[in-house]
A protein has these predicted regions:
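Short loop/turn and low-complexity linker motifs enriched in small/turn-promoting residues
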Residues: 1-83, 386
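Predominantly soluble domains enriched in secretory-pathway, periplasmic, or organellar proteins
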Residues: 10, 72-411
Length: 411
């Protein structure tokens, strides 16, 4: 502590929104009061920053001033249980976001760009833009060790294999389908499954050989995929009719477990392999499947036009991004803001809710369960939040589950 206090350092504090009251207190010292944005020179050491502004939650931040520091702090609306850490500006139409397994990077697929962008989650700065030919990317998928990344591309009906360390493309894998979107790796990671939206099939790619082993026929417009841990079954979300289909990978035969008449979009399984979750863009619902019996039931109602879903590592919270009511075109802003819901998988209750921007779409939870990222497709923006422990969510009285609804309609 004495060494830190031996010299002074510059401190800059920016808040969102600006005009917040700052209280800067050194250990055992008096508080210095100011208004954001703030720039000053202070003695080094441990500082406690308290940020307040009418209409927002109070924020307390502890900082070690051992170098020149610039802080970018976000104030949360009343009742929000998640804390916003920052925003990232991306390229055109961020379709999906994915944390690397070690949580150090966030990869963003750009449907309207030319590939993917990579951000450092600590500094929130862009590390790399990876060009994938003349088109954008739909989804990105990591291997468990985080060394390899796959990016799907609709226009070329292919998957690009990328070396994460060097950001270099190793190879481009043809799917032999049409309009390839969602990917899933087999449990042994020797096979890549790719959903082909227009040709109504799944490409089963042998990754050692780099070739399609077979094409599996599916329900119309397959999107979400989930292979079981034993490698025997593959579940498929069918968008056209709201189908949830199961394929026997030994025989290729299939069975439709549910048809809602809506638009089934995304699938994610729990870590124990007991439950599968699905969301339907047409009916604004989330479903849960008991994988032993294959019985399907409604878990919860969502906001309008749910998109991507993901689970916390313990399987206790399901996050759902919601695009909001559509405008006159998919590529035009609609009358509602997007949102993200945190749903208790045991009860189906909404534990908290965050309001996004125009067409909140991509979503991912980090492997350690500490970070949540989601994208606003039409705003070219990524939001990064800290995820509270489950016990805080469960005891939070629903957070902003009710309050956020009044903020969705644009004024």
């Amino acid at each position: 502590e004495r060494r830190l206090e031996a010299r002074s350092w510059r401190l800059a504090v920016t808040t969102h929104p600006p005009g917040a009251q700052l209280s800067i207190r050194a250990a055992g010292g008096a508080a210095r009061r100011a208004r954001s944005p703030y720039k000053g020179t202070l003695r080094g050491g441990e500082l406690e920053l308290t940020v307040t502004r009418a209409g927002y939650e109070r924020l307390v931040q502890r900082v070690t001033l051992d170098r020149h520091r610039a802080l970018d702090l976000w104030l949360d609306p009343p009742g929000l249980l998640h804390h916003k850490l920052g925003e990232l500006r991306s390229g055109s139409n961020p379709k999906q976001v994915a944390f690397s397994p070690d949580g150090r990077e966030l990869w963003v697929s750009l449907l309207g760009g030319h590939g993917v962008e990579v951000f450092d989650t600590r500094t929130m700065r862009k590390r790399k833009a990876i060009r994938l030919g003349q088109h954008g990317a739909v989804e990105v998928l990591f291997t468990r060790d985080g060394r390899t990344v796959y990016a799907s591309q609709m226009e070329t009906a292919s998957v690009w294999e990328i070396d994460r360390a060097s950001f270099r493309v190793r190879r481009q894998l043809a799917t032999k389908g049409n309009w390839s979107k969602v990917m899933a790796l087999s449990p042994d990671e020797r096979t890549l499954y790719v959903a082909n939206w227009v040709s109504n099939d799944i490409s089963e790619i042998d990754l050692r050989k780099g070739r399609v082993r077979r094409l599996l026929r599916t329900v119309r417009t397959p999107r979400g995929l989930w292979p079981t841990a034993d490698g025997r079954r593959l579940y498929v979300a069918g968008f056209e009719n709201g189908d949830l289909e199961r394929i026997d990978l030994a025989t290729g035969k299939s069975r439709t477990l549910l048809r809602t008449g809506g638009a089934m979009r995304h699938l994610v399984g729990d870590p124990e392999g007991r439950r599968l979750y699905a969301d339907d863009m047409g009916t604004n619902q989330a479903f849960v499947v008991d994988l032993a019996s294959e019985r399907v039931r409604k878990l919860a109602a969502t906001d309008n036009v749910p998109n991507t879903i993901d689970l916390t590592p313990d399987g206790r919270v399901l996050y759902v991004s919601n695009r909001g009511r559509n405008g006159s075109s998919y590529y035009l802003p609609g009358p509602e803001w997007g949102s993200v819901l945190a749903i208790d998988t045991a009860s189906g209750k909404v534990l908290d809710a965050m309001v996004g921007g125009n067409q909140t779409t991509g979503l991912d939870v980090s492997a350690d369960g500490r970070l949540l990222a989601f994208s606003d497709f039409l705003d070219n923006r990524i939001h990064l939040f800290a995820v509270p422990p489950y016990r805080e969510l469960a005891a939070g009285g629903g957070g902003r589950a009710a309050a956020h609804r009044a903020e969705l309609a644009k004024r």
